Amino acid sequence: WRATDEAQTGMTHDRAGVRIDRMIEGIKVLRGLWGDDAFSLEGNHYTITEMNGMPKPVQAGGPPIIVGGGGKRVLSTAARMADIVGVHPNVVEGVISPEAIKSMSSEATEEKLGWVRDAAGDRFDDIEISILKLVTIVTDGRDAVSEKVGGGMGMDAATILASPTHWWARPNRSSKNSSSNASGGRVPT
């Protein structure tokens, strides 16, 4: 998902639409090869002709597929095709930009979960939601630390404290307090 990852592997960093189209075909290939019969697909990125993938997965339907992203198209696709949907910053150009940072707010995360819910329809309750935690800090001084973290990310302290991607824990407290943020540690639904 990052341009540096693709550069290090010699891959071309295609535009987001091409990467999403390739992922959709890739998921179709995996699911097809995990099926009981020979599988064929004539796509723009993959061509499979009467291949019966072996060995077959032990788990019916194959292992769970996780698809993560931060944009509407990839999250909507994930909601329709994946078993686990990862809700992440919107990294359009393969770099963590100021816009990507802003897409980690509580409000942006709620909007993304709405896209997933809308696209998933009746299967929403069967999908596992995963949210990337970018910052975990154990401190008794969360307000001061949130100002410092927020300043480095172009966000104010209140936005950092409310963000589901940043969690706060107080040292030497019971475990029930070890994973809560300003919004009570709940993922917005």
Residue ranges of predicted features:
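Active-site-adjacent structural elements that line small-molecule/cofactor binding pockets in enzymes
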Residues: 1-189
